[in-house]
Amino acid sequence: MADENETVVSAPVSTAAWIYVFPKDKELLDVLSVLSLMERNSPIVISPLLMNLTVENDFSTTVKTPITNFGGTILTKITSFMPVCFFFHGTEQLVGMAEDHGDLIRLCEQTRQKFHLQSFEVPTARKVIDIKALCSAVGKDADSVICHVACGNGFKELLFAGLLIPCVEEQIQVQVGEYSCVKIPLYSATLFETEETISLSSCTEFIQERGFFLPALSETLFYYVFTSWGTTLRFSNTKELIDAGLKQFTQDGEQTVKLAPHKTYLGISGQKISAVEKDFLMLVDSVVTELSFSHVAEYLDSVYDPSQIMNFNDWPIIRNSETHAERMAQLTNLKLHLSSHLAVLIFAPNSILYCSKLAFIPNVKQAFNSVMTQELLLRSLSFCNALSSLSDDVYNDNRKIIKCDSTSGKDDKFSANHLAYACATSPQLLSFVVWNLNRMSVYNAGNAHTEIYNHLVNCSANLCEFCDGKCCQSCIGTAMVRVGTRLPAIPKNVKKEPLVMSMFSRYYAEVDILGSFGRKPVSELKEIGKDQQNTLSLDRGKFVSQIFDYCKKNSLIDPVTGEDTFNVRSKKDFVSIIHGLTQCIEECVSRCIVEMRRTQTPREQIENCLQSFNVDTTPYATAFSPFLTFSYYKVILTVLQNLALIVASGHVVDRPCTGNSISKWLVQQYQSLYGTFHSSYLKKGFLNTRTVKVASNVDMEQILDCDLYKSGKYVKTTIQAKLCRLSMQCLRDFRIKNRPFNKSSKTAHNNPYFKKNVKHKKNPLSGCISFLLFKYHDKLFPNVKISCLELWQRFLLNNVPKTLDIGNPEEVKTFIKFAFSITNTYDEIDIIDIQPECLSTFIDCYFHNKFLSALGFHDYLTSLHGLTSKLVTQNPVLFPVVLDKQPKFSSIQEYLVYVKKLVLDGVPNPVIASLSKEPNFGTIFTSRSLVTFGLTLEKFVSLANREYFQFGQLGWIGGSGVDRNLNPTSSALQDFRFMRQKTIIATKFSEVIVKKVRREAIMFDTEVVKGKVLSIVENLTNDIDPELLIIAEVMRDREDKPTMDDMLFFVDGREALAASIMLKLNHLVDMNVKDFSITNLQSVFETVSSNDAPVYDFSEILAEEDDQGNGVLKCDETETETDEPMTKKNRL
């Protein structure tokens, strides 16, 4: 049965690998030097795949690539290109721009030996491609060009093994940005040779002579891609991993066991668990590794459109830069912003870079010798930090332990080897990380930076183990000393922790205080017109929107950006504005509760509400950064393994292995496992995919005649191209959720983390309006020369001298009384525990605090917080990278003097990224941000059908060195706020690399006028004709008379009222009146104030109306109101 959400797509028949030949241009090299991964001693540069930078504007990211030749038919497979490309020729000048970080290649080799990872070995029998001859064949001088290769995910193993054949006869001239380039197709060797002859270890004479093989390129792929995948999958035999991937793509081996016979089991010997538990753990490990490896290939070899950020010329920072210098400055700033996220991934012990170990953590409540069930096993399995197990003994496929020769022993402290391991021992990745570490803040641990100073003085001895005293100002040794206090600890015990990852956010998010509660479903909106008798659900957003509409009408908030725009002129003005706003909020709360009753919305819906946001899982979401692409692959592999735990645990419990060989057992079970897993996790609450169907599976194409080309003749022939698979799943996004209400146990109300204590009278400067008091201090007290903080402290101490001109004392008393009143009123009902930093947050918090307290909620909620990156300047003495040469100082004083001299000579202060609190959390997602967060993937069984569902729970970011904003203030204060707060680290990319989409509700001029007109209609005016007020408002900024249609819009369709107003307006136009001020209009119509005139007494009637709602607009909403207290009235 076809998927109802299936999308029909098309893709061109084309090869999935291209060589690009660029002219060697200084400006291009400058840009690439900032965006790429490179190391001074490696000729290969890893760059992002961006249109108009590395590929042409109409580049096809997904293709049907010819893979097998059956005489009269070519079989094609769908694959998408990797988000990176590899510059392999002409890079001497480019890598020369890289900062020198010491001998990173040697460090990576030492790391592989220490942690038992495979090293790349150059095949001695393979012939290296002649790049000069290739350039000459397309009419280019090899010395004046720079070349890169872009390849599809399915072709990466072929590229590594030199099994791609360049066809210079099919060269194409393309325009890439400002440069005229040549691109050369690379065809799979499987088109020219039989499957039996295609392997990593041997090749035919044709492949030997014509194959595109570069040892340096293969080595880069070996570490950047394959070693990284291997460490994530706990599979140390990288060569077998590559061979398995090659066979999987060329021979459709997804449903066969490929890795298990060569797999070893790391991290099990060090766990204190029983023999039975070890068996379970090894079996589950083999299953999740195999399933994840098979399925990640299916997802990556699928259909993906280019993301919005892939067009380099459309980046706002590029489009708005007038000179090359401006462009480079903006790109460098972008790179610095990314260092905020890299810092989290490096310094958090629960980072995705470290958490590859599958551990068995027995349940404390589990009875001894109890029968193992799927639920018990699943609850005991977790991915955790692997750094403490890298040198452990391993088990082989026959469950025999293999002793590892490790002379160094276990490490107790994080070292440069661990950093290289986290970078998959790729020198280019490690160089990028060190560049960022050299530009991160130093966290002092009580030694007043003397450790850094002493290190720099000791550098003069040229004894550095990494650079031999050649570049200590920028080498990895100095970087490790600088951030030594921030590096993660090596865990001694296994524990369950969230996985910290960096992903690109999607626009839509339900992240306000109550998240999904009171959200009107789209399906219901469609049904409203069909059946008005249906019981409708509560629309909470409608009431919050009414408050924001009030703010927009009164010019308190910018209707587009949401920023504060109101202007305070005096204390009385301040009190009037805030009092009016709080009154509006309380009225909306009352209406919301009445609506809650009317729609019969139970209180339990509030307790069960969820906050959620989505992160993009398409391969091109983070294509602007090769480091994030490296991290992306780890995230997808880890998540697939986590999802596979459900199937694996059930299968292992039901069908245990009775023999010695794990791989033999897995071969017997794999067909069943693969079929079960293939659909077990889709539409289960976490991973969202898109089903696509390719429009045509058979094409008649002009394709290279492979048999003739092999014999030396180039001929294109019309041949049938048939697609292997029509329908497939594409990754779309993860849904991350948070429960605002603590429901972890029955005794949750006794949990000190969520229990609200009795508070005393609060200082307004630490309350809900503190941001306003600071912001408008100069306008509230224009003649006071002391700071806001000092003035309010004097108010609290009753110590304000009369020499301070604070204004009218009675007015000040009223103002102070109001500030204390609103602060303490808010504090009494505050269970969100967020101090507002802008008006929109104040509205959100005040509304929901009032709403929840009225419904009887008293304990604190879990709240979401954002830290956004910003750039700040720093003291250069802590950044040796500013030095222009190797440090040669005999004392600390000499170093400090030298740095001061550099500053005097004009060397700018170093700029680094820092994190600051985001006042409006929701803007993180509307501003299209890169987000770093913790994720716990919970699994639970549905009571309805006993199927397992997933819940992507937002978790914490571990470690004390990630950022100072994440650390608790002091344990002595008994402030458990940090336990209730979950933080996301973000960099907003709207108007940086993403064009801003105006999706916000924009208030047009006519809407603003309409709002003010309706306000006049609905409010009482004692002495002025409301119709004259409407005319004055409508004509304020107009030169021409509005039409009847305009007036009907302004008065919301009240035809009689519009006709009456137009009658007056026409009379004014006939009299040629130009001044439409209210004073002039009154004089024209000779209106007389009735304030002093006798009046009729309707007090008895009005008193009844006042009891019901204080105005005609509230009558229908307050028909069930009584004299009961508000809390009791609104109890459900």
Curated annotation (Swiss-Prot):
Q: What is its main location?
A: host cell
Which GO BP terms sit in this record? DNA replication
The record, for Pfam families, names: Viral_DNA_bp
Query: Where are the stretches annotated Required for nuclear localization?
Result: 1112-1132
- Where located? Host nucleus
UniProt keyword Metal-binding present: no
| Presence of keyword 4Fe-4S | no
Q: State the UniProt keywords alphabetically.
A: DNA replication, DNA-binding, Host nucleus
One GO MF term: single-stranded DNA binding
HAMAP family registered for this protein in UniProt: HSV_DNBI
Q: Which named protein is this?
A: Major DNA-binding protein
Q: Identify the GO cellular component terms for this protein.
A: host cell nucleus
Q: Which InterPro entries match?
A: DBP_sf, Viral_ssDBP_head, Viral_ssDNA-bd
Whose protein is this, by species? Human herpesvirus 6A (strain Uganda-1102) (HHV-6 variant A)
Q: Where are the transmembrane segments?
A: none
Q: How does it assemble?
A: Homooligomers. Forms double-helical filaments necessary for the formation of replication compartments within the host nucleus. Interacts with the origin-binding protein. Interacts with the helicase primase complex; this interaction stimulates primer synthesis activity of the helicase-primase complex. Interacts with the DNA polymerase. Interacts with the alkaline exonuclease; this interaction increases its nuclease processivity.
Family listed: Belongs to the herpesviridae major DNA-binding protein family.
Describe the task this protein carries out.
Single-stranded DNA-binding protein required for DNA replication. Plays several crucial roles in viral infection. Participates in the opening of the viral DNA origin to initiate replication by interacting with the origin-binding protein. May disrupt loops, hairpins and other secondary structures present on ssDNA to reduce and eliminate pausing of viral DNA polymerase at specific sites during elongation. Promotes viral DNA recombination by performing strand-transfer, characterized by the ability to transfer a DNA strand from a linear duplex to a complementary single-stranded DNA circle. Can also catalyze the renaturation of complementary single strands.
